[in-house]
Amino acid sequence: MVVDRAQQPQVVALIARLNRAGQVEWCLPKGHPEGAETLEQTALREVAEETGIQGRVITALGTIDYWFSVPHKRIHKVVHHFLIEAVGGRLSIEGDPDAEAIDVAWVPFDELDERLTFPNERRIVGAAAQHLAAQLQYDCQRADPE
């Protein structure tokens, strides 16, 4: 999950994909490791490919574990989510080698519940919001130690 902390209010990059029924699903960027990549390296590469944004991993947010079916096969998937701070790039789907994303958008935190298709990704957003709020409180306490 990539957040642009420089924008106020803070915004999160979401991608839109077409599901097998041809319906648009808005979701967090994700993908699978290539070669000997670490999970963090995979997250940063996938964010860059699917959104055009370069990032820096702040913390792990949790995992989502689910099953889906394709003809004659059930597939188990575990997605490791990280809170990633945007540090450069430009929002674009042009770099997506799989051309899975059909759109990308910066979405304010208060609109994510409505925009995200999957409830389990809303849980990840909640964990990110808690982390960012705690970090803001810590930063404020350091700035004003009284």
Feature-to-residue mapping (PLM):
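Charged phosphate-binding loop/patch that engages nucleotide di/tri-phosphates or the phosphate backbone
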Residues: E114-E146
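A short, polar/proline- and glycine-enriched secondary-structure boundary/capping micro-motif
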Residues: V24-C27, I102-A105, G126
